[in-house]
Amino acid sequence: FTKELKALVIEYGLDQNISFVGNRKDIKEIMSISKIVFSLSKEPEAFGRISLESLSLGIPVIAYSHGGVKEQLIKLLPKGLIEVGKINDVVNLALRWVAKPPKIKKNNFFTLEKMLKNTLNVYKKEIEKK
């Protein structure tokens, strides 16, 4: 899959604009200088932390429309959702966003406070059942 993406990057003349960085420990620094972050796993992720971190930094995300990333983008950047496997749609959207970056909604949905509150509520309901 990576070979296919790299070939498309070259085919569309984007090799000066897109980097494939592999596994890194300085991902926040890499993301902060990125124009777009891609989440193109063919298998759905349960939560999609990288996508949410990117959106929180103001970096738009283009992702396949499934899993936790889909839930995030529906709330924060619905235009970033692409049907799984539609790589040409990914490339075309990336070209548009390089020219004119999209606006990202403020993340009021996926916050630590809300996650903690929801988790505590689950425990409270279970305790009340007993």
Give names to the regions the model predicted:
Residues 1-4, 15-23, 30, 81:
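Active-site donor-binding acidic/aromatic loop of nucleotide-activated sugar
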Residues 9, 73:
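Conserved hydrophobic residues forming the short capping helix/wall of the S-adenosyl-L-methionine
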Residues 23, 30, 86-93, 111, ...:
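Hydrophobic alpha-helical packing elements
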Residues 24, 42, 59, 63-70, ...:
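Short glycine-rich donor-binding/catalytic loop of glycosyltransferases
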Residues 28, 51-56, 70-71:
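Short alpha-helical segment that forms part of, or immediately flanks, the ligand-binding pocket
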Residues 32-46, 59:
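Acidic donor-binding loop of glycosyltransferase active sites
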Residues 75-87, 95-99:
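Conserved acidic donor-binding segment of nucleotide-sugar-dependent glycosyltransferases
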Residues 99-129:
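A charged, aromatic-enriched C-terminal amphipathic alpha-helix characteristic of glycosyltransferases
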